[in-house]
Amino acid sequence: MSNLNDFNREAKAALWVALQWLLLAVPTGLVCGAVGTAFHLSVEYVTELRAAQSWLLLCLPLAGLAIVALYKVTKCEGVGTNNVIRAVQSGEPVSLLLVPAIFLGTVLTHLCGGSAGREGAALQMGGSIGWNVGKLLHLSDYVRRTATISGMAAFFSALFGTPLTAALFAMMVEDVGLTFTSAFMPAFTSALIAYGVSLFFGIAPTNFVLNSIPHLTLETALQTALLGIACAAVTRLFCWTLHTLEHGIPKRIPNPWLRAFAGGAAVVAFSYLFGVGRYNGAGMAVIADAVEQGVALPWDFLCKIFLTALTLAVGFKGGEVVPSFYIGATFGCAFGPLLGLPAGFAGAIGLVCVFCGATNALIPSILLGFELFGGQGLELIALGCGVCYMLSGHHGLYSSQLFVTEKLLSEYTESWGKRFRK
């Protein structure tokens, strides 16, 4: 009888937790889906407007001043994706004012041609919305962290139409080697709801068609492994450039107003020197050309690395994830044929590999390859990801990311041990 009572108590407790997750996931998914849809449409509109009105690029220095003012008014100076990651790790609060700040800042950046993505902004907005939904519902600190993960997953899903990748990425990006499995159902539910909202408003999921897919053989496996090694080197270069400029430029130009104006002018000059439009914005058209048509310039990835690092270092907003797609796709497309791989397929491998190495999220990266390319060539994509992940080092886009285990050894890191002992 006692066993039956224990079973009933456990069942009731589980039902109550499931109800809590549902109460959390539904509003988070709806709000993030709506805001994410508005954000997607806004960025898409200003990107088309800039393409039609090329003179808008000349306004980038002024846009930089407007972004500095916006962040001062909202008191969000210095707040970014690292703060959202820390909100999951330690319960650090995230201001709701971050949502309008990063929304408008990213739209201004894309309107005037800054080289940035949108997923970093999505993680910030989603994390902020999720954390504040948890606060509004008076949830415990632990559950509020789950709400933050759910918001990140929902916003990512609304923008890219990849709900499974979004949920796993939001669960795993904070602590490398640790999966916040209890957050899966609320995160995945929020991601599905947000995805449904974006579909309702006519936003098609991001996917690519691969025209030439080699069979899995010993030869293609070796070629893919070599490409994965090269992508690891590119990932290290991207992260090093990003962090070097983000730390170096503010030291050289401590005044944020001057930094934004001068940095914006430098981005404009670079764009006119190397090609207006090709390296500005997120670059989804260039990514599509590299993956679907097998067309990219050999220096595309280097130009995108520098211009993205410069754009973000001087104070413009957006993200690093889509630029990592661009860098990987163009590098793979240009370098892959030298190894004997089809250019487009090598671009697909490069896209996923550099994303994997830059975010240190192995399983979500493989799932991303499945959702973006429909499962085509998944074994080779997974192989490339594994090699790149293993060799890209303990670096990444997010400095607050904590490595729980070593990449090459099944051992806990010293930093994780210190945190665990606390």
Positions of the model-derived regions?
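Alpha-helical transmembrane segments and immediately membrane-proximal extracytoplasmic
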Residues: 1-422
